Amino acid sequence: MTPYCIRTLIALLLPASLVAQQIPRAEYAARRDSLTAHVDSGVIVAFGAPDPVGIRRWTQLPAFRYLTGFLEPNAALVLVKRGGRSSGTLFTVARDPRRALYDGFPPDSATVAGETGLAVRSLPVLRAAVDSLAAGGLPIYDLRDFATADAASQDTLTRGGSFIADLVARHPGVVVRNAHPIVDSLRRRKSSAELAILRRAVDLTVQAHKEALRGVKPGMWEYQLEALIEGVFRRGGCEGPSFASIVGSGPNSTQYHYQMNNRRMAAGDVVVMDVGASCGGYAADVTRTIPVSGRFTREQRAIYQLVRQAQAASERVARPGASWQAWRDSTRAVEARGLARLGLIQSADATFDPPWAERCRTDPVYCTQAFLYMAHGLGHGIGLEVHDPPHPWVGTGTFQVGDAFTIEPGIYVSTRLLDILADTPKNRAMIAQVRPVVEQYQNIGIRIEDDYVITPNGVEWLSRAPREIGEIEAARLTRAVMAR
């Protein structure tokens, strides 16, 4: 059987296996019980995602999906805890018959109740139901309708925000508390069912990286490589990308969140591919940086080896109970020593006068010269969101069993890197010393990102796509030989 036939067979089989890996109803009930266990007495009000604007793909909000598994728009969940007992009700809307011709007919109440294990009522009675509970003096726990990391939505009055504001206006004495921190603490520990789905997303992302490694060549457009990668996701039965795919070559490799993907790749470029499949609502996030021509240049190789060494250092620290701070510090230390050795900074502990000086008061790392070359976090949680709990890039927490997360060090040498610096004596001295080296390494951006889960015995590496220089160059060489 040819490799193409094997891949086709896998693609045909995967969607069925994905369905078998959904979260069981009992697990959703256990999640709701865990949430109400954090509440002495009160009413938890959660809002799902509304209808999308225009003809866009609809997705459920992660916290709402986590608690219900319900995948219809405009729903709300009310959990009531009093007297040591809890109950839950899902409020849904009946779709307009004409609208149903466009969007499909939603399940009836009996079907929803059977699938979710929740009592089901009509959304128009939500206000009266919560009013009666608030009038009884129960505090309200608000699970607002925005994604956890969606700061823009938090600053606007969403449907849920408007509901809570109106509730407070009607009941001035009601106590309202934020339920998101509680749900975030529950979401960070992934169950075996969640990990099965997440592994599927990661495996398909690894397959996409392997296809890209074989398919990239000089003269190819970034968007063609993006299409190759995302095609693997869809052929494998997943929803598509879990975020906007980043495919940045040459100078674009130095832009952390480059998304235009419209440059023609040239011989001698590296290309950063920061991509992830979304399968069953769970997001993978894996980055590889590869040479378009098949072999790294001397400068690219030096930067790549340094980034890989930094990633290995953080992998060694990531264990149950290990502090996030020690994890971050291990990588920063390796990068700082390596950058100093290459001459890109004056010394491993050298500082500069940054435009963000106020940040240095809370964390001195922001003022180190090494920070210029990696100003993003070292990693993040993955799950129902691509930036899921936990959030180890900040704070003083520790790793716990069940944490699924990324490690993504990088070094980026932009042609504009030194242009952002203020004209101060310290900065002038640094620029005078490092500018020739910056020019030598300019337009080289390297990021290596992998997905992991903390286990009782340590850490498991999930995303086993080629990442060592020898593996990458060997795979590219094999492709070149087969193409002859």
Model-based region annotation:
Residues P3-A11:
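Sec-dependent signal peptide recognition
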Residues M1-P3, A350:
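Intrinsic disorder/low-complexity signature
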Residues A11-A20:
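Hydrophobic h-region of N-terminal signal peptides that target proteins for export
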Residues A20-R484:
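Active-site neighborhoods and metal-handling regions in enzymes and metal-associated proteins
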